[in-house]
Amino acid sequence: MRQPPGESDMAVSDALLPSFSTFASGPAGREKTLRPAGAPTNRWREELSHMKRLPPLPGRPYDLAATVATDLESGGAGAACSSNNPALLARRETEEFNDLLDLDFILSNSLTHQESVAATVTTSASASSSSSPASSGPASAPSTCSFSYPIRAGGDPGVAASNTGGGLLYSRESAPPPTAPFNLADINDVSPSGGFVAELLRPELDPVYIPPQQPQPPGGGLMGKFVLKASLTTPGSEYSSPSVISVSKGSPDGSHPVVVAPYSGGPPRMCPKIKQEAVPSCTVSRSLEAHLSAGPQLSNGHRPNTHDFPLGRQLPTRTTPTLSPEELLNSRDCHPGLPLPPGFHPHPGPNYPPFLPDQMQSQVPSLHYQELMPPGSCLPEEPKPKRGRRSWPRKRTATHTCDYAGCGKTYTKSSHLKAHLRTHTGEKPYHCDWDGCGWKFARSDELTRHYRKHTGHRPFQCQKCDRAFSRSDHLALHMKRHF
């Protein structure tokens, strides 16, 4: 009957499990025989092997990958016995912690290829190693997990180029092959390169093409730098390249304002210009610097446009009620740009001093609301009645009355009254001149209607059928049938 495994068997099985570093840091000859030289997978494994191999420090005189590989090759009881060693347990915990790291993500988001940062990290690492005692022993685990790795160029990773400084990526011709120190404390910084996978993902932001940053003015400094990267990029899309936003803080004296400079598709650099927004047409306000300055020039260096007008111009007086400067700025359609401090009066213009006593302010001509509004602004002017034209037809009064006894009809036109009088007198001045017809009529419209009988003209056409009529009242009676 098979017995359950004991503690020694479990320790042996745990020790026999190969680690990730042993696969990545195998013999160079066996990798060359199994994989073709210069393959992308070979380069990726070569980079991982360099990243997994810790540099020997004075307080840590061992190589983690080499030590673990030696212990695994020895195997057997020796490995079981060494599992109880605290130094080996500490090394194994460090190795498992390194296996859990997403190295591609860390390398693609760490600023490790700039000379200034590399020199700073190297100096701090050497200072910390020199300050720690050499007799600390191998059981003390590193606190910052700092290790160095070289980045090799394309081609065979085992063959070093002779003219390009050891075949390193992004290395200058005259510079020796540097090793890029990696520190877990620098993950919050941003770098566009670091690794073969990161090079394939973001080749357009290599640090070689980033110009050196310009020195900041006194009182100002870089507050933040953000790299916005889209996860799904399509060819021809405006989001295919990451955009960098640099924010520079302003100085307390106001000489250097806050700069927010967005970039898209190019290397990040500080932009000396700020986008100027257009002033709205109905904004009667100026900035605080313009009020405190002696001239009418604005704080941004531009002259006010046609909608911004000086307040000290002599204007003709009107009968409209005057408005105070506070009521003018707090009106419904005009919004002030900055709130005025208590006790501060608006700048009257170049013709008057910026601050006047109360006795002198009474002599300044009062400003009217309609005078400040430019033509074509938000508030329309009151409509003025046009001369010579009536806005609505005046109702006519019936002034013409029939003087016949018992009639008493009134008309607005004299011609209508004249036609009516013919009914009383029996006068018919309109005669039909058709051959053989002697009809006479008192009104001209009656003669026109009669003449259509001779000609057959029917100008009133029905819209729902093909019938036509010579009189409009006949068409009205016909339309009642369709309804």
Swiss-Prot record:
Segments of this protein annotated with the region Interaction with ZNF296: 386-483
Record GO biological process: canonical Wnt signaling pathway; cellular response to cycloheximide; cellular response to growth factor stimulus; cellular response to hydrogen peroxide; cellular response to laminar fluid shear stress; cellular response to leukemia inhibitory factor; cellular response to peptide; cellular response to retinoic acid
Cross-link (Glycyl lysine isopeptide (Lys-Gly) (interchain with G-Cter in ubiquitin)), chain numbering: 32
Result when mutating residue 46 to A: No change in KLF4 polyglutamylation
Main location: nucleus
Recorded superkingdom: Eukaryota
Keyword Lyase set for record: no
SMART domains according to UniProt: ZnF_C2H2 (SM00355)
Tissues where the protein occurs: Highest expression in the colon. Lower levels in testis, lung and small intestine.
Biotech relevance: POU5F1/OCT4, SOX2, MYC/c-Myc and KLF4 are the four Yamanaka factors. When combined, these factors are sufficient to reprogram differentiated cells to an embryonic-like state designated iPS (induced pluripotent stem) cells. iPS cells exhibit the morphology and growth properties of ES cells and express ES cell marker genes.
One Gene Ontology MF term: RNA polymerase II sequence-specific DNA-binding transcription factor recruiting activity
Motif mapping: 9aaTAD: 99-107
PANTHER family: KRUEPPEL-LIKE FACTOR 4 (PTHR23235:SF117), KRUEPPEL-LIKE TRANSCRIPTION FACTOR (PTHR23235)
Physiological role: Transcription factor; can act both as activator and as repressor. Binds the 5'-CACCC-3' core sequence. Binds to the promoter region of its own gene and can activate its own transcription. Regulates the expression of key transcription factors during embryonic development. Plays an important role in maintaining embryonic stem cells, and in preventing their differentiation. Required for establishing the barrier function of the skin and for postnatal maturation and maintenance of the ocular surface.
Name of the protein: Krueppel-like factor 4
Record gene name: Klf4
